[in-house]
């Protein structure tokens, strides 16, 4: 894989979508992307055509349709397998840049730390699902669970967003542990949008300016 794969992670309400929008405006003219290459922005769940259908199943807030924790894990895995096969791998092999709103570490945080599914089981599944795709750099936009809930107070929540604060706390602690690995950059998402954006841009320039 020759392109660059960037992932934005964090609990709901941390501003991932906003920052990806900022990057999509800046990156094409940043000098980082080689001539002839493109920028692809995507998300999980729902980055592929099949994924959009799976997203509806996963996030449906009808309590009568609530999947078991294991079924939820496998739905996310199916979404990711299709996402990697149809979107991520072809783009990277074409020298394109891919920025994804969530990837496999969200599954570790939400289904592993949040749902208490054995982490080794998840890692084994992901080793198959990801098909060798691994982020070059992951940004963790960190906010407190309390701030997450406050920011989303006027929104209609999906099923995952409807979980209580204890679930969010477990997920957030999971992200903090995962973010200790290399190729992660932790940024406080309590700052204003432009400050966060500038920190992301600076990190990208520092990491990839010599790879043009």
From Swiss-Prot:
- Taken from the record, one Pfam family name reads Thymidylate_kin
Q: For ATP, which residues are the binding ones?
A: 10-17
Which terms in the GO cellular component ontology are assigned? cytosol
EC top class, in one word? transferase
Q: For this protein, what is the EC number?
A: 2.7.4.9
Which reaction(s) are listed as its catalytic activity?
Answer: dTMP + ATP = dTDP + ADP
Mind listing the GO molecular function terms for this protein? ATP binding; dTMP kinase activity
Signal sequence bounds: none
Question: Which biological process terms from the Gene Ontology are attached to this UniProt entry?
Answer: dTDP biosynthetic process; dTTP biosynthetic process; dUDP biosynthetic process
Q: What does this protein do?
A: Phosphorylation of dTMP to form dTDP in both de novo and salvage pathways of dTTP synthesis.
Family in the record: Belongs to the thymidylate kinase family.
Protein known as? Thymidylate kinase
Organism of origin: Prochlorococcus marinus (strain AS9601)
Give the taxonomic lineage as stored in the record.
Answer: Bacteria, Bacillati, Cyanobacteriota, Cyanophyceae, Synechococcales
Q: Gene encoding this polypeptide?
A: tmk
């Amino acid at each position: 894989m020759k392109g660059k794969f960037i992932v934005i992670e964090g609990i709901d309400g941390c501003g991932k979508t906003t920052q990806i929008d900022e990057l999509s405006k800046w990156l094409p003219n940043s000098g980082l992307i080689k001539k002839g290459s493109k920028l692809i922005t995507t998300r999980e769940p729902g980055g592929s055509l099949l994924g959009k259908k799976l997203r509806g199943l996963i996030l449906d807030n009808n309590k009568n349709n609530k999947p078991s924790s294991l079924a939820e894990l496998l739905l996310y895995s199916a979404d990711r397998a299709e996402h990697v096969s149809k979107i991520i791998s072809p783009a990277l092999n074409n020298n394109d840049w891919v920025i994804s709103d969530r990837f496999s570490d969200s599954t570790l945080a939400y289904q592993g730390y949040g749902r208490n599914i054995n982490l080794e089981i998840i890692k084994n599944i992901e080793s198959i699902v990801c098909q060798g795709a691994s982020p070059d750099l992951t940004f963790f936009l960190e906010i407190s669970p309390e701030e997450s809930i406050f920011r989303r107070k006027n929104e209609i929540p999906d099923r995952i967003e409807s979980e209580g604060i204890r679930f969010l706390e477990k997920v957030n602690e999971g992200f903090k542990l995962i973010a200790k690995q290399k190729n992660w950059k932790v940024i406080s998402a309590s700052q204003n949008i432009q400050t966060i954006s500038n920190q992301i841009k600076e990190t990208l320039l520092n990491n990839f300016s010599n790879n043009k």
